[in-house]
Design a protein with these regions (language model features):
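Active-site cofactor/cluster-binding pocket
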Residues: 2-5, 13-157
Length: 157
């Protein structure tokens, strides 16, 4: 029988002592395609926040992840979080593991939100369909629309 690992408990002692805990909920959206580590990154971030004493809620969509499909994870961190889903247009941070996914999800970012995007281009299997056009200029479009954008060559990290 396979043992399953349970999520860490919220560290309530830290939560009470830490004066830096925000009174508001921080909304982080991690997006990419299957196999990039979106689910692992969201799990690590959630566990670290729990251990730091925050309340954390997380929701994932990974239906076609094994076939290079879209993968997304909503992570909400705060003193008390009631829902795992980030309200539309209210992401404080979007961490995009792929350029086109950054462009696909940019409407979920707050006007003063911050986008971190990997400079990687992964053309999905659907690109073989002549109706699909991969946005070659995704970074230029994002740069023109956002004040807070950081492009990272994650393969070098």
């Amino acid at each position: 029988m396979k043992k399953t690992k349970s999520a860490p408990e919220r560290n309530t002692k830290t939560a009470k002592k830490n004066p830096h805990h925000a009174d508001r909920t921080i909304n982080i959206l991690i997006v990419g395609v299957g196999g990039q580590g979106v689910l692992l990154a969201s799990q690590i971030l959630s566990e670290v926040a729990l251990l730091a004493g925050y309340d954390v809620k997380k929701s994932e969509v990974h239906g076609m992840s094994q076939r290079g499909g879209v993968v997304s994870s909503h992570i909400r961190i705060g003193r008390k979080v009631y829902s795992p889903l980030i309200p539309s247009g209210q992401a404080d941070v979007i961490l995009a593991f792929e350029r086109a996914e950054a462009l696909r999800w940019i409407h979920e970012l707050k006007p003063d939100g911050f986008l971190i995007v990997n400079d990687q281009q992964l053309v999905p299997p659907i690109a073989g369909d002549k109706k699909y056009v991969y946005p070659e200029n995704a970074l230029e479009i994002l740069s023109a629309r956002l004040k807070s954008l950081r492009v990272v060559d994650a393969a070098r990290i």
